[in-house]
Amino acid sequence: MLQDAVSHTLRFAALVLLLGAAAGPARGDDAAVLTSQTETLKPYPAVRYFCSPAAESPAPEQLFGNPEAWPWRATGNEMANLGFTADHCWFHLTVRNQDNAENEWRLVVNYALLGQLDTYVLTSDGERLAHFSAGMDSAFNERASAEATPSFPLNLPPGEQRELYLKVVSPHSIQLPLELMSNPAFQSATLAH
């Protein structure tokens, strides 16, 4: 009798773990939150991604219209490092400025070897605010910034939220070391180099 109870308990625990693992990869944390104390933030818990062959990769408007229709996976607490792939990879994160007085931020991708990187900034209700291009395959006059390391401006007043989508296509390893930086922190880091 005791053995049956233990067996049933173990099966139930295994089922709960299995269901939790199946649900876990779909989403990261809801948002990367900027507080009054934030100058820089690595948003990995809020980042999710999926990759697909070029012919199956959604157009931006198709993705933005129904983002939950795609097979997102959470990156966890680490940066995405997908290795070499011919697939087109989409990344998503939500950024919320809880109470930081700084409006001007930068999304920095600390990896200069990405071939093509398109970044889309949307409001929380889906209105597209900006589209930026960067990467080794982009002409310098088409890039969002003059630095070799891609970075993108992000206007985010206190109390507001933005949806960020990044599309990466690269003949090199796809890594996405992200950092959100206040404009003063970004300027200071840029001057230090």
Could you say what each language-model-derived stretch is?
Residues 12-21:
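Bacterial N-terminal signal peptides
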Residues 24-28:
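Sec/Tat signal peptide C-region and signal peptidase I cleavage site
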Residues 29-191:
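Soluble non-transmembrane domains of integral membrane proteins
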Residues 2-13:
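Bacterial N-terminal signal peptides that target proteins for export
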